[in-house]
Amino acid sequence: MNFDYTEEQTLLDNMVTSFVRDNYDWDTRCNIVKSEEGWKEENWKQFAELGLLGVPFDEAYGGLGGKSADLMIVMEQFGKGLVVEPYLPTVILAGGLISKLGSEEQKNSIIPEIISGKIRCCLLYTSPSPRDVLR
């Protein structure tokens, strides 16, 4: 089995590594975390411009059609930099569920908005119970 990165994966790794190196030194990260938002909108916009928000999504919705290995590359570098922008909840969790289980209407309306950086999402799970306030 060959575990070497493809040429595209090497480019992705280099791009994300450069972003983290240039934008996430320890002091900068601490200032981001201490901010009112707890993350930086400018970084989120840059993720969109770099195509990082579209890595796992199908090309039919404007994504890059990446595989799990491509997401692993992004997440590994984000982990090294302790990146705090909501990539995991938006792109992987909520976006992943919409991608796998959403209707075509949901996919066509929500996924491009995630990829463009216009919206952020989170996963909400609830189960019916007498205390369920969402019923």
List each model region and its residues.
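A short linear-motif detector with a strong N-terminal bias
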Residues: I32-K34, E76-F78, S99-S103, K118, ...
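Generic helix-packing signal
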Residues: D13, V20, I98-S99, P130
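N-terminal glycine-rich flavin-associated loop
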Residues: V83-E105, R131
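Single conserved hydrophobic/aromatic residue that forms the stacking wall/gate
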Residues: Y125-R135
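A short, Trp-centered hydrophobic/proline-enriched beta-strand micro-motif
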Residues: G117-L124
